[in-house]
Amino acid sequence: MKRILTSSVALAALAAAPAFSQRKATIEHVPSIEFSSVPNFLKPPPGEYLGESVAVATNSKGHIFVYHRSAHTRLFEFDKAGNFVKEIGSGYYGFEFAHSVRVDKDDNIWTVDEGTNMVTKFSPEGKVLMVLGRRPPAVQGAQPFPAGPNAPAQKYVFCRPTDVGWDPQGNIFVSDGYCNNRVVKYDKSGRFLAQAGSEKAGKALGEFNLPHGLQVDGQGNVWVADRSNFRYQVLDNNLKPLREITNLGVGWTVCISSGPHQYAFLSNSNPNGNMPGTWDITGEIYKAELDGTVLGRFGHPGKLAPGFQVVHMMDCRNPNEIITGEIESWRVQKLILHPTTAAAGAAQ
């Protein structure tokens, strides 16, 4: 197990240094990537508005899915030009408090709902194909959150899950998230295989403190945004820890691009806690190779586009066209990257 270096600038010098004397580069040394923003490109139906745009994803046709918290949780589909196509799952029992949406290689749409503790697989047409987890039973009136340690995690029951991904074999990985502090692996039919972490938060490699985002790369390695530990972790396909990425701020969300040469995009949206007073401190996204070498950064905090106000999730199917969902600005942006114009410079 090893720690990932956080800048390509220092790579040559590090190669000659002993492993335990290597000085980790800081974010100030990462080149800036130029980009342009296309805000307000989505066209909801008349009289409809996007709420907290916590989750975005695209399919192979370029259609865009937004899973958002409005008057109630809703899942909208738009075409590549941003025109509204349809709503999926209207009135669905598994929707209460949106957290993540992903699209698999067969264009099935998967939602992760923090409120119902359910992960749902929809067909491209919007038919429910699979459900993982279960909704808690109804209670009368408001109930206080139980004091003391979390209850032991169960194989098929989640506690405020956050994200979902798949390896090339179709195995399913879920970050189970706010209470259980674990990553769970299931086979493609939903049978439990393994887990990393437990209901007790921890800081060691292979332990988590609010695993907030998850993706699987083409090698089958699992990338986890370990939010309250201020890091990203990379696990192998059996959920054994390989390395961690630190010095990129809060591990808020992670996205892995498609294609033969994949990149990781990592969001440092604000200090942990998500308090309004912190929204203007950070807002950048980092682009990295799968070995952890950071190639550049882009973005800044701001209420108006092209600024970010807490990037909760990204789609990076095309590594030069990033779609962001922002929780505090209720906004979805399309970002066109111009990586050939990246210029070295200190972080702002």
Feature names for model-found ranges:
Residues S7-A15:
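Bacterial N-terminal signal peptides
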Residues M1-I4:
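Positively charged n-region of N-terminal signal peptides that target proteins for export
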Residues Q22-Q348:
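Eukaryotic scaffold repeat domains enriched in small/polar residues
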Residues A17-S21:
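Sec/Tat signal peptide C-region and signal peptidase I cleavage site
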